[in-house]
From Swiss-Prot:
Protein name per Swiss-Prot or TrEMBL: NAD kinase 2
Binding site for NAD(+): 52-53, 124-125, 151, 153, 164-169, 188
Top enzyme class: transferase
Keyword terms: ATP-binding, Cytoplasm, Kinase, NAD, NADP, Nucleotide-binding, Transferase
Pfam family, one: NAD_kinase_C
Amino acid sequence: MDMERNRLYFFYKRDDKLIERVKPLIELAERGPFVVVDDYREANIIVSIGDDGAFLQAVRQTGFLPDRLYVGVSVLPARGFYCDFHIDDIDHMVEAAKNWKLEVRRYPIIEVTIDGAASFFCLNECSIRSQIIKTMAIDVFIDDLHFETFRGDGIIVSTPTGSTGYNKSVHGAVVDPLLPCFQVSELASLNSNRYRTLGSPFILSGSRTLTLKMSEETSHFPIIGLDNEALSIQHIERIDIRLSDRVVKTVRLKDNSFWDKVKRVFL
């Protein structure tokens, strides 16, 4: 890790219990070669303290900054996919930094554009579902090709790192984050003599654009999930999803690869 990066911003929930647990970490940083700042825009390292959900919030609320390093520190008994460090093991963090046992990993993110105007980024996934108990009808385009007309509860579009989350729970594939791609998975699709979809997840190259065109009856009540946040916009006609040119840079232990984490969590 570049030691010229020494301005830290700590992102965490300001409750009394967590403040007490974070205090020794801040004190250690201030005694070392780091400067702790109160504004993330002044930092070049953003440290998220909590769990994977907190890490997603940290990245989103600081604007998916491509020139910052993000570090995940867990407060739970087990480390997550984005948290390589544990708050109760400060010595391990210090030892790893001193002995160059860290490396920077660049994770792909997807860009979601709604009706050609508002754009949002996702590190895990974007999901499109109905706010009411009603089947959605969505025309699915890959680039300019009309691929299928989907009818069902919704669609999940996930990044490689997000493939272990919501996507996996609907039997999507786990994808290596070194692959520049994104995955499309169905939520309870209708398949019959009348309606037909592919009926399985599919993976698109990072050079592709996925376009979802809502039917008139579907456009009134969609809810868009952006990682762990929900966006409710009425009268959506079109959603374009592509792999962004941006990446999120994270600091991880060299001996804790993505597949190490998959094995630890699922096997």
